Amino acid sequence: MGLEFFFKFGYAFLTITLMIMIWMSLARASMFDREMEETHYPPCTYNVMCTCSKSSTDLGIVHCKNVPFPALPRMVNQSKVFMLHMENTGLREIEPYFLQSTGMYRLKISGNHLTEIPDDAFTGLERSLWELILPQNDLVEIPSKSLRHLQKLRHLDLGYNHITHIQHDSFRGLEDSLQTLILRENCISQLMSHSFSGLLILETLDLSGNNLFEIDPNVFVDGMPRLTRLLLTDNILSEIPYDALGPLKSLRTLDISHNVIWSLSGNETYEIKASTKLNLDNLHLEYNHIEVLPPNSFKYFDTVNRTFFDGNPIHTLREDAFKPARIREIYMRYCGLTNISPVAFDSLVNSLQILDLSGNNLTKLHHKLFNNFDVLRVISMRDNKIKIQKPTETFNAVHYTLLKLDLSGDRNDPTNLQTLRNMTRMRNMRSLSISRLGSSSVGPEDFKDFGVELEDLQITRASLSGIQSHAFKHVRGLKRLDFSENGISSIENDAFHEIGHSLISLKMSHGYSGSALPAEPLRHLTSLQELDFSNNHISSMSDTSFHFLKNLRLLELHDNRIEQVLKGTFQGDIHSKLEEISLRFNHLTSISQHTFFDLEALRKLHLDDNKIDKIERRAFMNLDELEYLSLRGNKINNLADESFQNLPKLEILDMAFNQLPNFNFDYFDQVGTLSNLNVNVSHNQIRQLMYNSSWSGRNEHGGMYHSNIKILDLSHNNISIIHPGYFRPAEISLTHLHLGYNSLMNTTRDVFGNMPHLQWLDLSYNWIHELDFDAFKNTKQLQLVFFGHNYLSDIPQDIFKPVQGLRIVDFSHNHLRGLPDNLFYNGGMEKLDVSHNMMLKIPSSSLSSLAALTLCELHLSNNFISTIHSMDLSNKFRSLRYLDISYNYLLRIDDAVFATMPKLAVLDLSHNRDLKVMDKSFMGLENSLIKLGLENISLSTVPEIRLKYLREFRLGYNELPSIPQELAHNMSNLRMLDLSNNDLTNVPLMTQALPHLRRLMLSGNPITSLNNNSFDGVNEDLEMLDISNFRLHYFEYGCLDSLPHLRSLKLTAYSHLEHFNIPHLLRHHYNIRQLWIEAPQPFTRIVKKGSGPTQEMQTLQLGNPTDLQREMEGHLPSKLTNITFSGPQFTNLNERILRGMRSPYLYMQLFNTSLQALPPNFFKYMGRVRNISLDIRYHNRNLKKIPNPNTGAVPYLPNSVFLTDLKMSHTDLNCDCDLGWVEFWQRKRRQYICSSQTWTDTVFRTFMNSPCQVYGRHNCDEHDDDLRETRCENKGGQQLMEALKFDLECGWDNANCREAAFVVVMVCVAMVFWM
């Protein structure tokens, strides 16, 4: 018996070990993929536009991101490639057989213009391609034929496309390989039975963000035995599809958040199989419409380890609400809960481990709520209104098991640590988060009965003013402390004495009110790794402040008033582990010699937005690992030679937005020798690039100085002269040179003619009148040349003859009347832009046959071209896919003139006012053309055009009284039809015969009525509709009811229509995401008055201005997250128009309005909105004031709004204290959203509840630049950023100046009377 036991134990142990190994290998594989995504590689040898992990003929991992590549790089076709990533490159096509010799494992093409995948696109990769990622393209169907033979494909991502249907055979051939299938953010409205038939090893299926309103019970009837993750978030499901989920026996994660589910009970109209019981690890039900959880709500669930109800309007939890399921973790945050039955969780007494009820409206906890709970470990009641009346009885049952307790929040009743300690005897407590203490200081007696197990302590928003000596002597195991959002002025020297060995993170952001960094208390923290004293009043720190912090890795001191960093503050032998320092937004005035010296681990150094005007020699020296150094937004006007010395791995040096009068290569000594050094000195005050002292000749030993700069940005200066030979120190290193937005007059060989590795040259937005014929004599590797927005009238014929690899040329916005013959002699041309010139004909003779053969895009708009001859578009343009000849003077299009361009997919002939389009004008394009623009060409009838593959057809601004029915037959695949600003008097009947129509624009037509039948017959899957600027006199609210899948609607606030109301119009449209509201435009209507001989005609003036109070009264759709108010007739908006918002997120835009200001209380009436982004960039010339949108002091407080993003560049505002809130908000944003420190979110918040996850950090720097490009009209055009930093002193608490002045006056008056 004993031997048998050991055998069984051995087999079990072996099995478990094998499973763990498999799991670890898969986890490591996914981690490896993520590492591959994030790792930075050097530029490719063959093309520096991309990065490669290898430099040989085997290129390894290739990244091409944010650089123009209309076609795949030719180097890929000539090498082995492990991974290829093409992101936002303008790619339009994957050529058949192009990748066949690469042996590729992973292909990612995202953010491009792929409209289809050829059947032979992946020929040769049948046994090598494992991952195919094609999101954010223009695909409309699953490329099943091209995928069919990929035997190893395990990961397929087709998200963010326009796919509408899934066929039975869409994934044929992938049955034995596909494990992950991502179809999120497409246009799928229904799933047919057996849609995923045969995918027996599929593990993850993502259908998020589609238009699914129900799931067919037979969709997963085959069982899909390995499917563990099913993501259905952000659809329009009204119930949980229990019958469809029944066959999925391995399902562990079900995400149906952001739908319109009202109940967990299922459909009452038919019986759900009793055997359908779900066993899940994660059930996501966030942001649905669940209002109540009745008893036995989980009758179709057996086990649910984690259940998420966040954001549902649940107000009451009844008894046995979670019966009969076994649930370990419940997250019910920001629901508006006001009442919980004392026996609501009684069915979970043996299973519940985590209960998070943060952000609700609970005022009390019943003292029997947690009775009999044996395993409850985490309780979070953060940001409620709770007053615990019987604390001892409330927590008595869990005082042995509770590990984490969160009672923080300034609406909760004040927490007395002594009472908390007595009521719980929490000897096992690991994490505690509280606010509003009964006392103003923390002392040793406060933690007397807490155990050494306490590791994480957060006391925020508690109005603390002091920390006493030995305050933590009873909790010696503390690892993390957070005292943010306090007013601590005193920290006694021995406050941290007992936790110096254990504390690894200390955060006191916006929590310390002293003027000097408390160095003495910090000397005990020898194990500290992260220190955050940001967003305070600190103005000084001693040179020994951090000398005892030998393990420090991250130091955040941004948003203070520090004036100087003394030499010796950071020392290499002490701070050998320091990786990142943030001193941005302080008052530093200079950087002295050896300030940052010998810090061997330092990788990032942030010094942006100070007052630095001088940097001394060797200020930055011997920083072997430094990769990023930002000095952006200072006042630097004096940069000493060799200021930067021995920084071999520096990749980015940002000195933009300073006051540099010149730029000298002598600033650098051994900088960037091991990296791809990018130096940004844009937005300075450089007027001349004079002869460099670094090239004054050879030194006494005969050597020369050489720079390692590869990317140099000198744009947005006022450079008018570049001395010959100026770039000589960098000639052999430069690959990118940006000189746009300057005042250059010409280009010469002495400046640009000897840069053998230069591949990107930007000279746009200058005053260039002429180009020397030999300007690029020895600059033979140029790929991209930008000469747009200059004054060129002539191009030398031989200027590009030495250039071998030219691909992209931009001559737009010049004065060119033509281009010389054979200007582009060598092959490889991909894009030519000569728009906005004075061209008289298509410059076909300027491209040799070799150059024209590879051309993909040709931009000819806004010229004087009057005819297109067959010779102009001869057989040379066999690869052309994009042709724009809009805004010219074309008169006629000959028959079949485009027939010699078999790949032409996009053609724009708009705004040729006298153009005559014949029936046969597009002959030859039947199988290729996808987008056609014929706007504003004076059409009165639509020619009979047969383009069966056309998807987008623009006919706006013509004179069409009707649209023939035959058009629908000839363009049966049409998806977007623009008929705006014609003479249509009703919705054309032909729109009913377009089965794939998704976008319909009818704006500006003289349509007078919309009734309940107006859109009957139009494809019910229509997603975008524009019905703005009609001349309506009759309107019915059911006119849009036949379009249930509408996502985007543009309409006018028809104020002249009685009872016109937008929320009522959208009451049944649960899928609306975007709403564009146009201001009513005035128009006249002639009506008959009287009868008989006394009858007379009367003119009525309609379309009067409105503030939208009546038109926006009511509840808006719950998915509505994007609202735009547009039109110069908007002069005022009512402060309550967004009171009906039911989404937690809102992006609001003001576009071309006449608003002078938003109402002061506008953002106080935002419904359920918690996070708002505001965009006022476009044509709001009268707007001068913006009230503070923030109604909460920190992000994501219940019943309050926090601004997440603000875009207002190129606007002129009044910069006074009414706008002073922007500075306060900026600091909060950097504190909570842009912080480098994340431990407070992962430690003090329960699962998946981090503000950083909500907001992200991707646009933190972009926001700062937006404020730099916003000007102060009342301060002579000063940058708003500079005004906020130094001029607008409006008080730390964002007090209004007038209010503060009023208070001061009243106090003075009171004192006078008292005296």
From Swiss-Prot:
UniProt signal peptide: 1-29
Membrane topology recorded in Swiss-Prot or TrEMBL: Peripheral membrane protein
Keywords assigned: Cell adhesion, Cell membrane, Glycoprotein, Leucine-rich repeat, Membrane, Repeat, Sensory transduction, Signal, Vision
InterPro entries: Armadillo, Leu-rich_rpt, Leu-rich_rpt_typical-subtyp, LRR_dom_sf
Tissue distribution of the protein: Expressed in photoreceptor cells and their axons in the adult retina, the ocellus and larval photoreceptor organ.
Subcellular location(s) per record: Cell membrane
Residues linked to a glycan: 77, 267, 305, 361, 422, 680, 692, 718, 746, 936, 970, 1012, 1122, 1152, 1171
GO cellular component: a single term: rhabdomere microvillus
A GO BP entry: visual perception
Job of this protein: Required for photoreceptor cell morphogenesis. Mediates homophilic cellular adhesion.
Name of the protein this chain belongs to: Chaoptin
Natural source organism: Drosophila melanogaster (Fruit fly)
